[in-house]
């Protein structure tokens, strides 16, 4: 696709891709070293003064549960505003932005993904951090205790694909410990890894701590020591092609506000 497409042309070209992944909030409710930014707005005051708008937020798959909660809270605090989410692996989100999919806000699970579309975004703001754990079946039937147990070839291990942030972090920590794992599959996002473990299709997998927490009735989480772990950072930014620039900036600012941070931290995310 030509890089000289007009904004309208870029939006038309990407509309079908985004539409297939959009998750209307109404149906759901009734490490890196990027500096903290503003996402295109100052964090003080802009969220409360936000104009009503229909916002489309492209968000990393690991934010699925918490963002549904956050979106409902934001809509309640901002009557007339509707927040619609499209959840996917960060690499898919970046592809959507590059292809001109119509959206207002982008939130990825690493800063490197955000950097790939820096020409299309405002200044990112780190809104949360996360860490990896080993997810196992309920009761940890295979007695997985630490990372080196994942090298057992009798164990069915599933990992996120190396193209996605969770896969990059997984490779980083396994390589650092000189542990060789032969996964039975590599999944397109971290939620797919979690699903494999939940369904018993895998004995163990590396997922974010918050993902394991969201499925604690179906999986156990084996903690990984900080010295062996990686810190995932979540940058949020407005998209320059947004037709709701002021409202988009206000939403990003709200994610860093006390109310937004409480929702994120209650779900197990760490302070930025």
Report residues per predicted region:
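Exported/periplasmic ABC-transporter solute-binding proteins
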Residues: 2-7, 11, 16-63, 68-72, ...
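Signal peptide-proximal N-terminal region
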Residues: 75-84
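Conserved strand-loop elements at the edges of beta-sheets that form or border functional pockets
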Residues: 87
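Pocket-flanking alpha-helical
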Residues: 91-122
């Amino acid at each position: 696709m030509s890089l000289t497409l007009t904004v309208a042309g870029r939006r038309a070209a990407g509309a079908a891709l985004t539409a297939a992944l959009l998750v209307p909030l109404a149906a759901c409710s009734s490490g890196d070293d990027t500096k903290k930014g503003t996402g295109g707005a100052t964090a003080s005051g802009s969220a409360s003064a936000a104009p009503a708008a229909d916002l489309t937020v492209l968000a990393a798959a690991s934010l699925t549960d918490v963002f549904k909660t956050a979106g409902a809270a934001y809509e309640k605090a901002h009557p007339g505003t509707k927040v619609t989410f499209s959840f996917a692996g960060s690499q898919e989100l970046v592809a959507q932005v590059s292809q001109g999919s119509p959206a207002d806000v982008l939130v990825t699970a690493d800063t490197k993904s955000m950097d790939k579309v820096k020409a299309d975004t405002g200044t990112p703001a780190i809104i949360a951090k996360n860490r990896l754990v080993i997810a196992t079946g309920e009761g940890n039937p295979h007695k997985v205790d630490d990372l080196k147990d994942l090298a057992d070839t009798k164990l069915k291990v599933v990992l996120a694909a190396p193209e996605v942030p969770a896969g990059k972090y997984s490779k980083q920590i396994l390589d650092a410990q000189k542990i060789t794992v032969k996964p039975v599959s590599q999944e397109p996002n971290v939620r797919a890894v979690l699903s494999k473990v939940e369904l018993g299709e895998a004995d163990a997998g590396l997922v974010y701590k918050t993902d394991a927490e969201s499925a604690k009735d179906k999986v156990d989480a084996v903690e990984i020591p900080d010295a062996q772990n990686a810190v995932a950072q979540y940058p949020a930014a407005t998209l320059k092609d947004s037709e709701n620039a002021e409202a988009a900036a206000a939403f990003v600012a709200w994610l860093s506000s006390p109310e937004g941070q409480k929702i994120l931290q209650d779900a197990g995310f760490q302070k930025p």
